[in-house]
């Protein structure tokens, strides 16, 4: 959220305006923003909980979908799987998407390398500029590749990008409380299904 304040200070725009101008519009991310348009409201999945029997139920706590004026740097965005795929594809392409250069390749390299040494609490993992980063497969005890980067959202959304395998995987969810079970399970199934190219 400090980054959002810095964006507003140095750009003279709100974080919402800056992200729309510099990221969402160039990537044609029409479904992404801090508020949901009235025509898209029916496409939004409400937040769910599990009851004691494990059944999905609508959560009593729902995010406001319109009228939001606080633009966090770490939370508050609505998006779709197809929009998020465009963002991830740009990262996998080292900052380029359909001929547009949003970031330099070196910027993406810096964003996706471990910046914290061994301070990150998960073994075999580090932290880049906005992403968890796999640094050691044996220590991480997870399938993947060194250099894979990932993150999750508050309602169990999850994505990872594996540059070595040229792979993007996105899991969209609206489930609380946060639990990484499905993200880890999905990653395991994806890597178990990969076939070596000869």
Where in this protein do the model-derived segments appear?
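Short, well-ordered beta-strand elements
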Residues: 159-160, 166-175
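A short, polar/charged loop-to-alpha-helix boundary motif
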Residues: 178-188
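Residue-level recognition of short loop/turn positions
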Residues: 53, 164-165
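Short, basic, low-complexity termini and linkers enriched in Ser/Thr/Gly/Pro
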Residues: 196-198
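Short, surface-exposed loop or secondary-structure junction motifs
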Residues: 1-146
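Conserved H-D interstitial segment of serine endopeptidase catalytic domains
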Residues: 191-192
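Short, surface-exposed beta-strand/loop micro-motifs that present aromatic residues
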Residues: 148, 155-164
